[in-house]
Amino acid sequence: MKDDVPNLKDYSSRLREEANMDLADIKADGEISEPTKKTQIVAIYGKGGIGKSFTLANLSHMMAELGKRVLLIGCDPKSDTTSLLFGGKACPTIIETSTKKKLAGEEVKIGDVCFKRGGVFAMELGGPEVGRGCGGRGIIHGFELLEKLGFHDWDFDYVLLDFLGDVVCGGFGLPIARDMAQKVILVASNDLQSLYVANNVCSAVEYFRKLGGNVGVAGLVI
């Protein structure tokens, strides 16, 4: 019976040491490794209304306070990820701006879609109007445009992606399916729906890792 009791000696100090580790140095299985890329891309998932945007707004602000270059990208058709940083105001979305520029015969520039507040760079991918298109396809189109703008050459320390996890659409699973992110963070609570969503995302991560993917689950925020 005694052997079944976990050793809790110095448990608190070990947790503190782990919490102080750089996210880039922690594998999904807990082993330490070298960062695979200079810019660490972290995707956050969870059911709608669980607090993903609130969590990321605070996380990105604290990272900026620590001197990190942080880009926060809202990948939800509601386009409300960055509103907390901008005092409740919505940023012009990439999809909306791209459509207007295309109709005017102009090209989209980075200054049209990327904004800065409190040291955090932020943008919203956006999505189609209700009943007028596919939200997942809008996400894919948004990232294609970001790649044309040199997304991978912007020299950020961290890029934080805010995704809703209620759907199984491939567009919203882009960071996992295409190995765009190094880590996934889940936001959940004690209700069954949020745990169901978290479990689905973990299953997707496991599936693509079996196919050779490198995305891992960094942790769970309750």
Which functions belong to the PLM regions below?
Residues 30-31, 109-112, 172-175:
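Short beta-strand/turn micro-motifs at beta-sheet edges
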Residues 38-42, 65-69, 75-163, 167:
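Nucleotide-state-sensitive switch-loop elements of NTP-binding domains
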Residues 53, 132, 192-195:
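Loop/helix-junction capping segments adjacent to catalytic residues or to phosphate/diphosphate-binding pockets
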Residues 53-57, 139, 202:
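Short amphipathic alpha-helical segment that frequently serves as the phosphate-/nucleotide-binding helix
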